[in-house]
Amino acid sequence: MSMQEAKKENVMRRVVLDKVTVNIGVGESGERLQKAYQLVQELTGVKPVYTKGRKSIREFGVRKGAPIGVKATLRRQAAVEFLKKVLPAVNFRLKQSSFDNYGNVSFGIAEHVLIPGTRYDPEIGIFGMDVAITLVRPGYRTMKRKRKKASIPRRHRVTKEEAINFMKENFNVTILEG
């Protein structure tokens, strides 16, 4: 056995990008929601879905079940390409508090016009958005599938440190304290 074979890493321990979810919460239905739908479709190239209000809040004029936002999920290569497109909007910097203990990363973009390659369209207006990144290891499907579900041991889950290292190595992200 040579030295290179001994140093091979276990493929099941690799951290992989599962999905990127883009969300715009408008807070109301109507014309503004349609514009947000159009914007997410332009940015991602995927047909978005409407998010609905979970409960009625009279002060905000939100009804339970009424569409109040738009989201789109990107997987595989489309997710990587989208991340490379939006990370310059935050100057390739993420706060340490953006990472949770389960391999998820979230950050917000204040105005969509900060994304390189997008222009201001007076008909659409300006929207902020949330970008959520989910990192997993091979074998996570056993937790989600319908038949023969099984739990994943804690040692196989993606930790905060592993998520930070993944983002540093693959997307050249600088991590800020706080």
Curated annotation (Swiss-Prot):
The keyword Ribonucleoprotein applies. GO terms for molecular function: rRNA binding; structural constituent of ribosome; tRNA binding. Keywords: Ribonucleoprotein, Ribosomal protein, RNA-binding, rRNA-binding, tRNA-binding. Gene3D superfamilies: 3.30.1440.10. One of its GO terms (cellular component) is ribonucleoprotein complex. GO terms for biological process: translation. Belongs to the universal ribosomal protein uL5 family. Part of the 50S ribosomal subunit; contacts the 5S rRNA and probably tRNA. Forms a bridge to the 30S subunit in the 70S ribosome. This is one of the proteins that bind and probably mediate the attachment of the 5S RNA into the large ribosomal subunit, where it forms part of the central protuberance. In the 70S ribosome it contacts protein S13 of the 30S subunit (bridge B1b), connecting the 2 subunits; this bridge is implicated in subunit movement. May contact the P site tRNA; the 5S rRNA and some of its associated proteins might help stabilize positioning of ribosome-bound tRNAs. This is Large ribosomal subunit protein uL5.
